[in-house]
């Protein structure tokens, strides 16, 4: 009887202590990220190493573009679970976004850790698709003088092709488009569509064709102005 009494005494507290997390999950699923954040923070106060709560807080910070906070929570995750590939991937992504908000000198100092985080994710999970995508974008967007490389981007794109043909074609299309090799990019997007990426592939192909038309129009205007100047 005493055990039963103890159960009824403790049970409401257990339900209450879990409710902030559960309510936070529900709000997160409804994309109410700021409201979810408040509840997750409340839950974390009494559950300081609760992995899923920390991940949710990193994710809500990311959705709210609060990259400093996202980096904080994802760093805590990878420290708590150093063998979890996805936490390195998320940390690298948040750190990359943070780098866009600081001065160039600070950003330069973060480059190695960003790349290293994505590479670590692949070491821990050799089939990690998102980390390879991140490295493709990393190498094409970074200036060559500080480590950008079309060849390295293609290397990771080729790895994607082996894991997921659609991701391989789409990533290679992105590389070719970035370096203005439009015919090659179009070919890759069409391959992605044929492989089953009807929505994303069609969207990227349409954007490519739109950009090509704009470039042709801009070049025509430029040629027209040049001809006037020459005359």
Regions found by a protein language model. Give the residues of each.
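Canonical tetratricopeptide repeat
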Residues: 52, 56-59, 90-91, 134, ...
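N-terminal leader/linker segments that initiate helical-solenoid repeat arrays
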Residues: 15-56, 62
């Amino acid at each position: 009887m005493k055990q039963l009494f103890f159960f009824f005494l403790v049970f409401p507290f257990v339900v209450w202590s879990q409710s902030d997390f559960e309510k936070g999950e529900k709000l997160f699923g409804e994309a109410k990220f700021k409201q979810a954040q408040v509840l997750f923070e409340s839950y974390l106060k009494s559950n300081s190493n609760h992995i899923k709560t920390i991940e949710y807080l990193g994710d809500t910070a990311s959705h709210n573009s609060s990259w400093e906070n996202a980096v904080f929570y994802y760093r805590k995750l990878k420290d708590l679970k150093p063998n979890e590939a996805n936490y390195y991937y998320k940390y690298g992504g948040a750190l990359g976004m943070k780098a866009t908000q600081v001065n160039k000198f600070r950003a330069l100092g973060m480059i190695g850790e960003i790349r290293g985080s994505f590479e670590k994710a692949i070491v821990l999970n050799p089939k990690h698709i998102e980390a390879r995508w991140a490295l493709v974008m990393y190498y094409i967007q970074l200036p060559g003088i500080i480590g950008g490389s079309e060849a390295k981007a293609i290397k990771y794109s080729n790895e994607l092709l082996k894991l997921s043909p659609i991701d391989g074609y789409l990533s290679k299309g992105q590389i070719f488009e970035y370096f203005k090799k439009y015919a090659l990019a179009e070919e890759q997007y069409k391959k992605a569509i044929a492989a089953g990426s009807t929505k994303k592939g069609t969207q990227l192909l349409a954007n490519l064709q739109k950009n090509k038309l704009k470039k042709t129009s801009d070049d025509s205007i430029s040629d027209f102005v040049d001809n006037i100047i020459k005359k």
